[in-house]
């Protein structure tokens, strides 16, 4: 190997670099090529529930690199010479959804963009809108998809809803008027009812839920400022579940449930530190049996309620391991009961699977 370096190194520096890299691999000490006896065991987490139900942690992800197929030896060798490629990573993720093809879409206010993870096809895309005179993406918050997998993203700072095609191509912005002013103060939660051709959006500062047509025209609003039934104090996330609309009423420390016309039905939660109480409710979703999952960002846990508002169980604690959270935020459950939870401060999305009784899916069109 030394003779080869002396012979070719001066005339062919690139060859010299490759030879050096190969030499480094070949000359590794014996202990480095053996598996460590103290090798970390893959993390596991599982919760057994009544009636044979089970909630299982599957994996977590945080960067583009985890979507890509395993790199070959020659790719890794090239990385030694030229440097490893730069991969996009989650910075301050907030909201999550998955589309009909299983792609996972994550908003990231910290990166001022939206990540699309396609594990099935080993593809990744990052959506940004910078340097636009109008409709620049500044602080993407919540995300939803329609029946055609078009992507809808609220931006709480820009005060608009960005609409993208499934491939990430920008379509238009909703809520921005010609003069630059808009009718949203701080749009946050969003859900799309494709069958009714309607979009539901919470405006946190207006204490209202806007109901729009697909062109962005206002059809009606739901709610007003207050702490009574049908009134809000900084509403944030929302979700369509079967015939109902569920809204996180953050500073009233509850989730309110309406029918889709806006008529109040009931509420879940209250301020407190006992099971069933809420302190900082964030993401919400429902599984195939209609049970309601509510993230509490401050407590680092998820509480699960039945359709009568009774607490069934809760899971999670503060930490960095499987099933542990630091400032969890968005939550989404797909039609296969895959549970996606944004673990914001840990800069990752944790993936669980709920094995229940497999009743018909109650989740509304997103």
Each predicted region: which residue ranges?
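Bacterial N-terminal signal peptides that target proteins for export
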Residues: 2-18
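N-terminal non-cleavable signal-anchor helices
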Residues: 3, 24-27, 242
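N-terminal regions of proteins, emphasizing targeting and processing segments when present
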Residues: 6, 29-30
């Amino acid at each position: 190997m030394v003779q080869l370096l002396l012979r070719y190194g001066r005339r062919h520096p690139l060859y010299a670099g490759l030879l050096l890299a190969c030499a480094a691999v070949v000359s590794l000490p014996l202990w480095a090529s053996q598996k460590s006896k103290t090798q970390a065991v893959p993390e596991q987490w599982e919760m057994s529930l009544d009636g044979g139900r089970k909630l299982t942690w599957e994996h977590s992800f945080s960067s583009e690199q985890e979507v890509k197929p395993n790199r070959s030896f020659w790719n890794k060798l090239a990385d030694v010479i030229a440097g490893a490629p730069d991969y996009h990573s989650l910075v301050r993720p907030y909201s999550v959804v998955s589309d009909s093809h299983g792609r996972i879409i994550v908003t990231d206010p910290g990166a001022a963009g939206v990540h699309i993870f396609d594990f099935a096809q080993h593809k990744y895309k990052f959506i940004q809108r910078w340097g636009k005179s109008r409709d620049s993406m500044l602080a993407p918050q919540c995300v939803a998809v329609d029946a055609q997998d078009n992507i809808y993203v609220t931006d709480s700072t820009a005060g608009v809803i960005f609409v993208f095609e499934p491939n990430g191509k920008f379509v238009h912005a909703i809520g921005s008027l010609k003069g630059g002013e808009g009718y949203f103060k701080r749009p946050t939660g969003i859900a799309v009812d494709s069958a009714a051709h309607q979009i539901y959006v919470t405006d946190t500062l207006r204490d209202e839920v806007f109901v729009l047509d697909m062109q962005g025209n206002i059809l009606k609003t739901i709610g007003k400022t207050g702490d009574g039934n049908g009134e809000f104090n900084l509403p944030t996330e929302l979700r369509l579940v079967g015939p109902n609309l569920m809204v996180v009423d953050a500073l009233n420390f509850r989730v309110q449930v309406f029918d889709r016309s806006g008529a109040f039905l009931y509420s879940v939660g209250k301020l407190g530190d006992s099971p069933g109480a809420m302190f900082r409710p964030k993401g919400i979703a429902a599984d195939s049996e209609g049970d309601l999952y509510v993230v509490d960002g401050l407590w680092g846990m998820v509480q699960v309620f039945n359709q009568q508002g009774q607490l069934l169980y809760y899971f999670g604690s503060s930490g960095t391991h499987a099933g542990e959270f630091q400032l969890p935020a968005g939550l989404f459950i797909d039609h296969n009961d895959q549970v996606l939870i944004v673990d914001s401060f840990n800069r990752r999305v944790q993936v669980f699977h709920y094995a229940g009784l497999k009743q018909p899916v109650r989740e509304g069109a997103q």
